[in-house]
C-alpha cells in the first residue's frame, strides 16, 4: 500500500514538473473566452496518438478566492466516440501559467464536448486532421 502511494506521488510530482517546465515556453493560441476566463491551447503539444492530447491554459480574468490566477491542463480526446476528458492539471498563482503551483487538478472522466463551448473548441483542435 505504501509503495503504491509512493509511486502515485512520484508520478504526480513528475507530471507537475513536466507540465510546468514544458509549458513555460509554450506558444499559446487563444481559442475562447467567457466572462471569467481566457482559454489558450499550445498546438505544438498536440500529439497524433489514437487518443490525441493537448496542453491548455486557463487564465482567470480576476484571481480566484484562493489567489490562483491561471491553470495548466492536459486534455485528451476520443475522436471516434466524440468524447473529451481533462487528464490532469495544476493551479498557479500568477497569470499565463507562471508562479507557484498551488494545487493539483484530477481527471473528471469522459464528457460530451458539446456540454461546454470551450470543450467543443478543444475537441475540434484535437480531432481535426493537420
Predicted regions and their residues:
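N-terminal secretory-pathway/extracellular module detecting exported/lumenal segments
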Residues: 22-130
Amino acid at each position: 500500500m505504501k509503495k503504491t502511494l509512493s509511486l502515485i506521488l512520484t508520478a504526480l510530482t513528475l507530471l507537475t514538473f513536466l507540465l510546468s517546465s514544458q509549458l513555460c515556453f509554450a506558444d499559446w493560441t487563444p481559442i475562447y473566452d467567457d466572462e471569467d476566463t481566457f482559454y489558450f491551447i499550445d498546438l505544438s503539444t498536440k500529439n497524433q496518438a489514437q487518443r490525441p492530447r493537448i496542453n491548455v491554459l486557463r487564465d482567470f480574468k480576476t484571481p480566484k478566492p484562493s489567489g490562483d490566477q491561471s491553470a495548466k491542463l492536459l486534455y485528451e480526446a476520443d475522436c471516434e466516440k466524440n468524447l473529451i476528458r481533462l487528464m490532469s492539471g495544476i493551479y498557479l498563482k500568477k497569470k499565463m501559467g507562471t508562479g507557484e503551483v498551488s494545487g493539483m487538478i484530477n481527471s473528471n472522466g469522459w464528457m460530451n464536448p458539446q456540454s461546454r463551448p470551450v470543450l467543443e473548441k478543444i475537441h475540434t483542435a484535437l480531432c481535426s486532421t493537420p
